[in-house]
Structure formats: C-alpha cells, structure tokens
C-alpha cells in the first residue's frame, strides 16, 4: 500500500513538472555490480535494471562538467544576491551505454538513486528514484515529446545564418584539409527565470537538479566533437525576474544582452543563456550564430514550451549552442546519422531515442575550429574543472594519471597501443594517443609536422618535438608585424586586410572600399551603420575610428547579386557603390561580427584596429625588437622569441650553414650544448662531412699541385721537343743545299 502511494505521488509530480513526458511506468530495483578495484569502481560503474522484465546492463564512466567553484545564485526578497555551493553534486554524474544496445546513450546522476536518461535507437526512457522507498525502487517512464509546432529560431536569425553556409556535403578533399579535433571547453552560465523556476518545482535543489540533468545530456551530445560543455554556475530568479521576459525570444535577447554586460562581467563564462517558460511560444530560441567567443553577442534565449519534456529541452539548448559554434541546420537530403536522429534536424526536438550530430555538423564544427581563432574554448587552465583533478578515461583528453587516452571503444585509433578501458599503455610501447604518436605506437621523430601554417606570412608550422605525443602550442607572428609588403599587420596568426575580409563575404574580386565609404557608413547613428553598441543602442564612430567600425566594400558588378538583399546595405558615395552588411547578420567563425572590420586591420601608420577603435601598435604589446634580438635575420613570435629565417639558428638567429630556421617554440629544435640544432637535421652525418672535408683538403691541395706541376713540366718538354725538331729541320735543309 505504501509503495502504491509513493508511486502515485511520483506520478503526480511527473505530470506536474515533466511537461508531455510519457507516463508508461515500470518499477525496477537497480542492482550495482561491485568491482574489486576501488579506484576503478569510482570511475566506472555497472548497473543492471529491468524494463518490461528485460534486463539491461548499464556501463557507466564518470562525466565531469561541473567545475569545483560551481555556485547556485539566488535573490532573497530584498533583492540581495546569495550563493550556495552544492558540492555534493560534483561527483554524481556518469555517462555510458547499455550493453544490449552498444549504440545507446545513458546519462545518469547516481547520488540519492539513479536519475537521468536512457536513449536507445528509437525510444527514450527516464529513470528516477521513488522517494521514501526502503527497497531502492525506481520508476522508468517512456519519454515522449509532442510536436511543439514552433520554430527553433526567429526567421531573421536562422535565415541569414543559413544563407552564409548553404547545405552541402563536403568533398573528402575538403575534409582532409581540416585539422583533427582537439579537446575544447565551452563554459556556459545558465539563468532560470521566475516562471520556469515555478514550473520546474519552485524549490532550489529540485530546479538545480533538473538543469544539471539537462546540461549533462547536452554535454553528452557534444562529446562527439571533443567539446566539454561546462556549467560554470546557475542563477535562479526565484522571487522576481531581473528583466522583463515578455515578448518574443529575440526581444528578450536584446534586453538580456544589456543586462548581462552589467551584471555578469565578473562571473566566468564563454556564453550565457536565459531559460524562459512559455506555454505556447511562436519559436523557442534566439541567439547569434558563430558568436561563442564574441563578448558582445555571447548570449542566447531558450524557451521551454509546455509541449516538451527535459529531453526535448536539452535538444533545443544543444541546437542553439550548435549554432553558436558554427553549425547549421541539416538538409535531410544530404546529411545523415547512422541509426540515430540528427541533432541539427528540426524534428529532433520531438523525436525519441539516440541523437547524434550529422556528417554535415561534423564538417561545420571542424571548419569552425580549424580555420579561425576559438581561444575562448581553450582556456582550461583558468577553469580548473573537476575533471582536472579526477581524470575521465575514454574522453580523448590526456589527463593526470593517464598514460594515454584514445577515446572510447568506437573512437580509439590506437587500440594496439592504448587500453581504452584503463588508459594505460600496452606493453612497452612509447605512446597511445595524440597527433605525434605513430600507428606503430612510437613517438613521431622530431621535426615531423603536426600543425600546418594557415597563413604564409603570419602563422608558422608546428612540429613534434620527439619527446611528447602532443603537438607544441600554436606559434605565430607577434601581433603588429607588417605583412603584405608593409600594407597590413599580422594579428593572431593572420594577415588582416579589408580586401580579404570583403572577398570572404562578397566573393572573389570584392575589395575594401575607399575612405569616403567608411566615413559615410560609420558616421550615421543607425542600427545597420554604427561603431558598436552601448546599452543596446548603436554608436557612431569617432573620426579617428571610422576605419575600424562597419566594414565597407566594393564588389564587381557580376557579383552584385550574390549577397542577401535582406542583410546587405548599398550606399552610393562619390561615384562608388559601397556595400556593407547588417550587424548580427553574419558571423566570423572566430565569434566576431562580419559586419565590422576585423581586429588587427591597419587604420593608419603604425596603427591598427582593436575592438572598433584605432590604436597604436606599440601600445598593444609589441615588445620584441626583431632588429636587435633577432639580428634582423628573423621575426618575433607570440612567445616573444625569434622565428629565424632559413640559414640562421635560434634563439638569436646567428648564421649557421644548413639551418632551416624556426624558433625554440615550434617543436623543431632542441638545446644541445651552447647552441641550438634542428632535430631531424642529421648532425651526425654533418659532423662527419666537416671532419672528412678537413682531412682530405690537404691531400686534395697536394694532388692538385702535383697535377699542375706535371702539366707545366709536360708543356716545357713539349716546347723543348718542338725547338729541337725545328733546329733539326734547319740543319737538314742546309745539308741539302751544300750537296
């Protein structure tokens, strides 16, 4: 009787707070399979549950997406901000699969019972503990999301983004040119507004548990990209909203952007999302695509419709974050997912079962992180997340106490080198993962390229150093170095010119516009023509900054129809047809707005653009004098060291015959005695050559001298013989005359 009452209570709670999630109930008592190894038991767990009498074996590994400084912020009735650290939640989260369905996804919290999601091929289940149960009973329910019949994004956001990256399946040659995925980390700050707080239970720990559960599932989805979605902190507007949440998502987004600039500046995050409950919204999301590293647009709105549950809401957030990191929605005729629903498919929100990113999404993401700067996703050392102290084997990230980490069973390409279950090397092999590990489980020889240059003047190729399976950090020309024959500057590894920027937007032949165009479009106080925003209001540029505001281009007439009329602005100025685009209509993959001139673009003698202002180059850290430090035989790199020209050796670029140049940072050199020599350059044979040359040079000189003397003697003898013959001839003639 007590169990029935508990089940009815749990059923009522699910109906009240889980939206349209199905109530197809099963009761199960999970059974944990114990391990003799306590260390392995903490990182990996096995549970057996039953659904409809069928046993399922869940293999789980530790999932880390909450940092040690994770806080939950709330406001009291007087408006004061308070924070709580739910430290007990840090070690609860696991992800894995059901052995009976190897392609399944399982995401669970194991503290105070099992709570989370089980996604099989075409069906999803939720599992939660029965409160006050003495027998560890849990309920399992089939999760169903009714079609919310709403768009994910407003037309003015999604349409403009999609026109910049049309649907197409990339050629294999294009994919091969993109670099391999490296571990990255996206730090997200979540805010829950009052209506959603009430809808999810109106209690701090209950709401926190649900949001952590949602982000845990989102993080599981993004592991395909080796991208860890870290929930930096959670803010609950439990008493009243700090901004108005009326209107559509894009209206709320503008208000939220202005609010976060003032109130979230000291709280670490790469992007912030406001979660809003709306019973029947027109669309359920608003964000700026490709802006994850842009502090002016690093925000989004996700609406929770009444028609979906936590799983569907997780997909909404995953799709929005996907747009932030360069993804587009899938064309179902050209993009596919093997035995799963594609996450960037519009129907994924209402679909049940396993969800993964498509081949198109994979290409979009690889392009995003390969071709442009995404440094905000690489600052793991500043986050100090949980998995830094507690490594997770199988996530493809080499962490403390791991000898190798080649990913999970399906991802690992070094199975004969690395045990993907324990992250230990097999036998006496040298390595088991990383770009500088060979298929023979050996470290790549020093001097093997591991990261190609993306700019011939401003970026440098990196090499394996022969002692590590990882590639050395990226090296490029120090910001402020002249490039393109002195008409541009290097900035973050790229030669920044308005011609290149215009060509990327409007096609081949487009160029930076004359000064008159820049002056015109950056002096008007309008939304499409400005030098940035303040309190959500557009600002005209100061005269000194007009070359650093909106990007103005001129394009050939044959390309004039290639741009989207809804986002392109045409101006006729002094016999020039100037072209620009609306702010927010197109984003660079480094997170900056294509509408503006890129940072590092020259705006005057010894000046370049930074954050829409024209600044002197020497004020921006150009503290390495290549003329003195590198003796004029190299340039300064981003580590403040010399990148020497061929024929000169680092660190000070002294002349050395045969040296390929380079720096002490690019992985191609090691210190040997009092000078640097290139690894991979065969110094052994070089020394033998010099020694042999010194030994045989005297013999060569003697031999040459002997040959020379011999020739001289031979010539002298020949002259004497010729003279003798001539004299003999004269004597003979005289005798003939006498007779």
UniProtKB/Swiss-Prot annotation:
Key word Phosphoprotein present: no
Membrane side Extracellular: residue ranges: 177-687
CDD domains linked to this entry: ZnMc_adamalysin_II_like
Consequence the record notes for mutating residue 362 to K: In a cutaneous metastatic melanoma sample; somatic mutation
Post-translational modification: The prodomain and the metalloprotease-like domain are cleaved during the epididymal maturation of the spermatozoa.
GO annotations of cellular component type: membrane; plasma membrane
Domain Disintegrin: 390-479
Domain EGF-like residue range list: 620-654
Coarse class of the protein's main subcellular location: membrane
Ranges where the Peptidase M12B domain occurs: 184-381
Gene3D superfamilies reported for this sequence: Collagenase (Catalytic Domain), Disintegrin domain
Signal peptide positions (record): 1-16
GO molecular function: metalloendopeptidase activity; metallopeptidase activity
Membrane topology: Single-pass type I membrane protein
Keywords recorded for this protein, A-Z: Developmental protein, Differentiation, Disulfide bond, EGF-like domain, Glycoprotein, Membrane, Signal, Spermatogenesis, Transmembrane, Transmembrane helix
Glycosylation sites: 36, 76, 122, 149, 156, 177, 294, 359, 465, 561, 611, 625
Intervals, Cytoplasmic compartment: 709-739
Cysteine-cysteine disulfides: 293-376, 335-360, 337-342, 450-471, 624-636, 630-642, 644-653
Tissue expression profile of the protein: Expressed specifically in testis.
Iron-sulfur is among the record's keywords: no
Transmembrane segments: 688-708
Example GO BP: spermatogenesis
Domain comment in the entry: A tripeptide motif (ECD) within disintegrin-like domain could be involved in the binding to egg integrin receptor and thus could mediate sperm/egg binding.
Its biological purpose: Sperm surface membrane protein that may be involved in spermatogenesis and fertilization. This is a non catalytic metalloprotease-like protein.
Designated name of the protein: Disintegrin and metalloproteinase domain-containing protein 18
Organism, as annotated: Homo sapiens (Human)
Underlying gene: ADAM18
């Amino acid at each position: 009787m007590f169990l029935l009452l508990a089940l009815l209570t749990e059923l009522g709670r699910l109906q009240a707070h889980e939206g349209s999630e199905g109530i197809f109930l099963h009761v199960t008592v999970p059974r944990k399979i114990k391990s003799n190894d306590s260390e392995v038991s903490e990182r990996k767990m096995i549970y057996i549950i039953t659904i409809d009498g069928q046993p399922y074996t869940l293999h789980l590994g530790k999932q880390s997406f909450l940092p040690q400084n994770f806080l939950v912020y709330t406001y009291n009735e007087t408006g004061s901000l308070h924070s709580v650290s739910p430290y007990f939640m840090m070690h609860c989260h696991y992800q894995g699969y059901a052995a009976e369905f190897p392609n399944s996804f399982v995401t669970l919290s194991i503290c105070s019972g099992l709570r989370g999601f089980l996604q099989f091929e075409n069906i999803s289940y939720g599992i939660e503990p029965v409160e006050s149960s003495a027998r560890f009973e849990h309920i399992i329910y089939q999760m169903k999301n009714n079609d919310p019949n709403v768009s994910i994004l407003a037309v003015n956001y999604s349409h403009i983004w999609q026109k910049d990256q049309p649907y197409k399946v990339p050629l294999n040659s294009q994919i091969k040119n993109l670099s391999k995925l490296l571990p990255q980390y996206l730090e997200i700050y979540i805010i829950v507004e009052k209506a959603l707080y009430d809808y999810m239970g109106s209690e701090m720990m209950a709401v926190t548990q649900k949001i952590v559960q949602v982000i845990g599932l989102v993080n599981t989805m993004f592991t395909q990209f080796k991208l860890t979605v870290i929930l930096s902190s959670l803010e609950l507007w439990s008493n009243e909203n700090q901004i108005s949440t009326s209107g559509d998502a894009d209206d709320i987004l503008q208000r939220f952007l202005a609010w976060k600039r003032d109130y979230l500046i000291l709280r670490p995050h790469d992007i912030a999302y406001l979660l809003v409950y709306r019973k029947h919204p027109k669309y359920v999301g608003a964000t700026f695509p490709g802006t994850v590293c842009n502090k002016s647009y690093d925000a989004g709105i996700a609406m929770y419709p009444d028609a979906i549950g936590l799983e569907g809401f997780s997909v909404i957030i995953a799709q929005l974050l996907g747009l932030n990191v360069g993804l587009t929605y899938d064309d179902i005729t050209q993009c596919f997912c093997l035995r799963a629903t594609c996450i960037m498919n519009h129907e994924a929100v209402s679909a049940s079962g396993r969800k993964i990113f498509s081949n198109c999404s994979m290409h979009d993401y690889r392009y995003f992180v390969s071709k442009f700067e995404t440094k905000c996703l690489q600052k793991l050392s500043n986050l100090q997340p949980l998995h830094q102290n507690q490594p997770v084997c199988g996530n493809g990230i080499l962490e403390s106490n791991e000898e190798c980490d080649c990913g999970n069973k399906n991802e690992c390409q070094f199975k004969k080198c690395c045990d993907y279950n324990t992250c230990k090397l097999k036998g006496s092999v040298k390595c088991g993962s990383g770009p500088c590990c060979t298929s023979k489980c050996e470290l790549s020889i020093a001097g093997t390229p591991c990261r190609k240059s993306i700019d011939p003047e401003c970026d440098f190729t990196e090499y394996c150093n022969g002692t590590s399976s990882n590639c050395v950090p990226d090296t490029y020309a120090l910001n402020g170095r002249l490039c393109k024959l002195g008409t541009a500057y290097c900035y973050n590894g790229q030669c920044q010119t308005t011609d290149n920027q215009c060509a990327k937007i409007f096609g081949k032949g487009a160029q930076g516009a004359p000064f008159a165009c820049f002056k015109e479009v950056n002096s008007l106080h309008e939304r499409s023509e400005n030098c940035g925003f303040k309190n959500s209001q557009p600002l005209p540029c100061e005269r000194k900054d007009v070359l650093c505001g909106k990007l103005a281009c001129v394009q050939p007439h044959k390309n004039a129809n290639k741009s989207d009329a809804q986002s392109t602005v045409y101006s006729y100025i002094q016999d020039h047809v100037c072209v620009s685009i609306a702010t927010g209509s197109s984003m660079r993959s480094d997170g900056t707005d294509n509408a503006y001139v890129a940072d590092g673009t020259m705006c005057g003698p010894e000046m370049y653009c930074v954050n829409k202002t024209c600044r002197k180059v020497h004020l921006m850290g150009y503290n390495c004098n290549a003329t003195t430090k590198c003796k004029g035989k190299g340039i300064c790199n981003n580590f403040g060291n010399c990148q020497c020209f061929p024929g000169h050796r680092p660190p000070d670029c002294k002349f050395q015959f045969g040296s390929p140049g380079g720096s002490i940072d690019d992985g191609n050199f090691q210190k040997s005695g009092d000078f640097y020599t290139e690894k991979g350059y065969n110094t052994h044979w070089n020394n033998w050559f010099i020694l042999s040359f010194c030994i045989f040079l005297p013999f060569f000189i003697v031999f040459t001298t002997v040959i020379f003397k011999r020739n001289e003697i031979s010539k002298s003898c020949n002259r004497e013989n010729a003279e003798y013959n001539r004299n003999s001839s004269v004597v003979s003639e005289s005798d003939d005359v006498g007779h």
